[in-house]
Structure formats: C-alpha cells, structure tokens
C-alpha cells in the first residue's frame, strides 16, 4: 500500500514529535570495530560521536499493508548531520527508498526491516537500477561518515528481503528483475556491523562507487520453502570501489560468498565462514566488450568454505561474446586481475578448492581458446599492417594461493581444482604454496592446468578434459 499525501504529512509529523520528546530508554552504543588483522592500506576516516539530544526514534504504522518508507525517510532527513536514527520496531517498506544524502549519522537497527513481497513485479519496475548485470535494489545508501549497526546478542537486528516469492516466480519467468537487499552507492567512510540479513531475492549486498567501508560481524542466510531453488544470493559484491574490509561474518547462501566485480581495488576479506556458496570469487570480469575491468590488491585471509562448488575462484569471460543465462551474457572485455592473495584457506567438502578460468560462460572451449580474453581493435591509421589487429588483453597476473587445506567433495574425486588460462601470455606469476587439500578417496589430488607456469605451483598438473566453470553463477 502506497501512502496518500495526507498520510505522508502525518507520518512526517509523527517522526518530528518522536525525535523531540525526551526518551526514557538508552540506545545500543556504537560498537568500536576495527579491521583486524589486516586493513585496506589506510585507516578509516574519523567518525565523531553523535549529538546525544538528536535522536530519531522511528514509529512504524499500524496497518499490516502499510508503507513505512516515508516515515523512515523523514527521520533520516531530521536527524541527518550529527544525529542518530533508532529503528527498534518492525517496519514494512513497500516503495523504494533513496538514502544517498547521508552525512555524519548513526543508524541503530535493533528491530526488523521487511520488504513488501505482495507484488514482485512492482519492485521489478520501481527498484533502483544499476547499469551492471541487470542489478537493482530496494533501497540505496550513500554519503559520508555513516555507521549502521545492530545487536546480535538479542533477537531482532534483521533486514529481510522475503525472497521466497521471487525464487518461485523465476521458475517460470527467468527474466524477472529481482532487487538486491542492500546497496552502498557513493558512500565515503562507513561501517556496517552486527546485523542479520535474511532471504534476499538476489544478491545480499553491493558496495558500489564507494571508498573506506568496513563490514563486520554480519550474519547472512537464505532458506527456501517447498524445495524452491534459491538464485543469485551473493553475500557481498564490490563494484567500482576502493579500500573495503569485510570481516568476522557468517554467510549461508547459494552463490558467491564474496565477489569482486569490475574496478574493485585494495580490498580485504578476512575471518569469514561461508557455507553453500560458489567461493570467494574474482569476477566475473570482461563481460562488456571494450570496457576495462581492473581488480587488484586483494587479500583474502582466514576463510572457511564448506559445501561449496568452489573455494578460491577467478572467473573471466572469453574474448568473444557468448550467451550464458537468461539475463547474463557477454565477453570481449579488457583489463587485468593483479596482486591477489588467498592465504589460510579452509575447504570442507567443496567440489573444487581452486578454480581459475578465462572461459567463463563459454561451453565451446575450442572457441574460447581461439579468442583468448581479448578483443580485436583497429590498427592506428598510420600502420602499414592493415591485415592484422592489435590485441587488448584481460590478463591475470601475480596471484598467490597459499596455506590452503581441508577436503574436497566426492563430486570430482580425485580432481581438486582447475587452473585454466586461454593463452600462455594471458596469465603470469600464478603461484600455489603449501597446498595440502585432500580428496575423499585418499588418492593423490589432481589439478587440471592449461597455459600456466607449472613450475610455480606446489602440485603436479594434468591436462584438462575441459573447463567446468560454465554452469555456475
């Protein structure tokens, strides 16, 4: 239900009254979280204490079909620039909410946020759109100096996307646009901690066009009823963002636990426990022809992956357009993956411990190798070699995977991983050190390799029968 103009007026007035009245109870204090043991290369900007008398306690509506979006919006407007928002009740958001104007504000979420699922096609039309992989979001947060936190020692502190109806609908309409649960978009200097996220229709989080972000002590889970398949439930995706730390969190999902999308730099992921995922993934990259994707300076430390398709994973589209899924196709992009380290990585029943592919989404491996993550560009006008083309590459270089242990699943036993590059000059300095992953049969683990320097790997390679990484998201 969308609020009328009169309803909006009284909702806004109610927030003002609540904010100005003396409060009879304390609020949960802002947690003192720090990146540890690693940071993203620069300390987070200082976030000063908020004014103790500028507090907005948000009062939800009483109607079960209400829309609390406007009430929340007016609270943020009132307590912006030095105040604190308290969301300690149960709220229903039924329309998109743009919170990209935030400055110097804390948000205490000890209640519950639910997104209205009565009409999934309403959100397909009205959610905020990203010009990347057909993504959209219920609400988006941007600005500077923002702290969002809850209290995991008690019930509540929940953001619920009510994804079940979306998952059910895409069984018959795979082109349905499903919103993500949360977006930082254009945020500078923010923390998010001690919250529960549940049942996102699509990705849980995107961190886009943002810098200096710290995510800590989060609990992300999806659960389907009646056997409906959960789709695209990435934990975090970073996109065009710099200096991000994601740490000390638990993720139970069915897609990438963390995914570094184009132009993600100086990012640390540490102390995560992921179950059911597709790995800690670089990419996919190179999806859009002639676009440059750069991912570099990543450190992934002390991560446990269980019951997943992949552990450490790098996925790059080939140098030719390919159709993959109903809303996902591409190839022919440019760029590089550089200086990525996976360190202290635990595998528990994962199909593959290591996956590197430059043929993502392409089932025809021969065709992929004929177009090795590059796109032909016209020669300069003065060039005499008019019968040839210049090659602009998407390369993978300076990758280290070390201190990896645990077990794979029985699915591909005795194979434990694949490292497949589309051409010898597209991958360089890929190293594996102290890899002690075992397979269930007790046989020697096998790794399928192509176009990588096997002298830098701490295991023996076999020739690949084919690159599996064409059917997973």
Describe each PLM feature range.
Residues 2-473:
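Extracellular/periplasmic carbohydrate-active domains that bind, remodel
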């Amino acid at each position: 239900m969308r609020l009328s103009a009169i309803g909006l007026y009284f909702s806004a007035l109610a927030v003002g009254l609540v904010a100005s009245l003396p409060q009879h109870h304390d609020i949960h204090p802002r947690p003192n979280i720090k990146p540890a043991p690693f940071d993203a290369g620069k300390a987070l900007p200082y976030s000063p204490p908020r004014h103790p008398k500028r507090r907005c306690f948000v009062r939800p509506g009483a109607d079960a079909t209400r829309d609390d979006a406007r009430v929340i919006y007016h609270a943020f407007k009132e307590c912006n620039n030095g105040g604190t928002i308290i969301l300690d009740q149960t709220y229903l958001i039924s329309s998109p909410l743009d919170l990209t104007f935030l400055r110097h504000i804390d948000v205490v979420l000890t209640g519950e946020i639910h997104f209205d699922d009565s009409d999934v096609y309403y959100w397909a039309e009205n959610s905020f759109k990203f010009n990347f992989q057909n993504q959209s979001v219920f609400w988006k947060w941007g600005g500077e100096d923002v702290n969002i936190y809850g209290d995991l020692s008690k019930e509540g502190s929940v953001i619920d996307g009510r994804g079940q109806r979306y998952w059910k609908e895409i069984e018959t309409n795979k082109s349905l646009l499903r919103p993500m649960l949360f977006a930082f978009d254009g945020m500078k200097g923010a923390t998010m901690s001690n919250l529960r996220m549940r049942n996102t229709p699509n990705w849980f989080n995107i961190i886009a066009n943002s810098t200096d972000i710290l995510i800590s002590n989060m609990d992300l889970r999806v659960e389907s009823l009646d056997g409906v398949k959960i789709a695209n439930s990435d934990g975090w995706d970073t996109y065009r963002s710099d200096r991000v730390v994601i740490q000390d969190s638990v993720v139970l999902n069915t897609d990438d636990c963390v995914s570094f999308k184009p132009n993600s730099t100086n990012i640390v992921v540490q102390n995560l426990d992921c179950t059911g995922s597709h790995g800690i993934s670089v990419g996919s990259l190179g999806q859009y022809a002639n676009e440059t994707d750069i991912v570099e300076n990543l450190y992934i430390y002390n991560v446990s992956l269980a019951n997943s398709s992949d552990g450490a994973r790098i996925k790059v589209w080939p140098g030719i357009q390919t159709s993959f899924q109903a809303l996902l196709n591409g190839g022919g992009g440019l760029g590089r993956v550089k200086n990525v380290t996976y360190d202290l990585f635990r595998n528990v029943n994962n199909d593959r411990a290591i996956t590197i592919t430059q043929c993502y989404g392409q089932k025809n491996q021969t065709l992929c190798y004929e177009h090795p993550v590059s796109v032909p560009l016209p020669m300069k006008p003065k060039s005499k070699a008019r019968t040839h083309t210049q090659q602009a590459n998407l390369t993978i270089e300076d990758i280290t995977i070390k201190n990896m242990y645990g077990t794979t699943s029985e699915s591909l036993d005795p194979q434990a991983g694949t490292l497949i590059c589309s051409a010898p000059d597209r991958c360089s300095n890929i190293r594996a050190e102290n890899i002690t992953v075992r397979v269930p049969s007790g046989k020697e683990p096998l790794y399928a390799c192509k176009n990588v320097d096997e002298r830098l790997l701490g295991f023996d390679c076999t020739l690949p029968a084919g690159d599996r990484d064409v059917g997973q998201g």
